[in-house]
Regions:
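A sequence-level detector of short linear motifs
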Residues: 12, 108, 135-136, 155-158
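Contiguous beta-strand/loop segments that form the cofactor/metal-binding neighborhood of enzyme cores
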Residues: 60, 64-144, 169-173
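Predominantly a Rossmann-like dinucleotide-binding segment in NAD(P)-dependent oxidoreductases
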Residues: 1-81, 88
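A short glycine-threonine-serine/GTX helix/turn-capping micro-motif
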Residues: 53-59, 157-168
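Short, intrinsically disordered, charge-balanced linker/junction segments flanking boundaries
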Residues: 9-10, 163-173
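Juxtamembrane/interface motifs at transmembrane-helix termini
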Residues: 33, 128-129, 156-157
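C-terminal helix-rich "cap/oligomerization" subdomain common to oxidoreductases
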Residues: 102, 149-152
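Active-site donor-binding loop signature of nucleotide-sugar glycosyltransferases
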Residues: 18-20, 111, 129, 159
Length: 173
């Protein structure tokens, strides 16, 4: 995706939208992550539920999404506005972020902890340019990267299952 954007295949970036959602309402309420019940080492729930420790969806999850957005676009945020829904521990369950970049482009970003357990969540980035649009979808079992150009051309890039949202994890060589 980064190479496509650097090579100006979609032209000058005018807008970016992205969303990241995952099943973490328990953590933001101060309840330990149920998926770690059988693990030898369980993370402290306060890691995600204490506002003084950077808890909440924005710090804990959207940081991953923004790393992806900024990595592939090379844009620099200039102005940012955010609305959120607080949890009982006063950290954010959701985020609705509007952004203006230094090149004049705009961005609309969303994050939510309200996803059913065992779903895996959503992670996508869409980059709108003067020549076309890049779609990068990293939802588990729906991984895809494609470009739709204004001239009618479509370019599809194969992404293997598991090489999307989990691709930044460790794998056996």
């Amino acid at each position: 995706a980064e190479e496509i954007i650097i090579n100006k295949k979609i032209g000058e970036i005018k807008h970016v939208d992205a969303a990241f959602s995952s099943s973490l309402t328990d953590l933001f309420q101060g309840i330990p992550l149920s998926e770690s019940n059988n693990h030898t080492f369980q993370p402290h729930a306060s890691t995600w539920s204490d506002p003084n420790k950077g808890g909440g969806y924005g710090w804990g999850q959207l940081s991953h999404m923004f790393a992806g957005v900024l990595k592939i676009t090379h844009l620099e945020p200039d102005q940012v506005f955010c609305l959120s829904v607080p949890s009982p521990t006063n950290v954010d369950y959701t985020n609705a972020v509007s952004m203006k970049f230094s090149n004049g482009a705009t961005g609309s970003f969303s994050g939510s902890a309200f996803v059913p357990k065992d779903f895996g969540g959503t992670f996508y980035i869409t980059v709108h340019g003067t020549l076309g649009v890049l779609y990068l979808d990293m939802e588990v079992k729906r991984e895809r990267l494609f470009v739709r150009l204004n001239n009618g051309d479509n370019i599809n890039y194969e992404i293997e299952e598991g090489d999307g949202a989990f691709s930044y994890g460790t794998k056996e060589a």
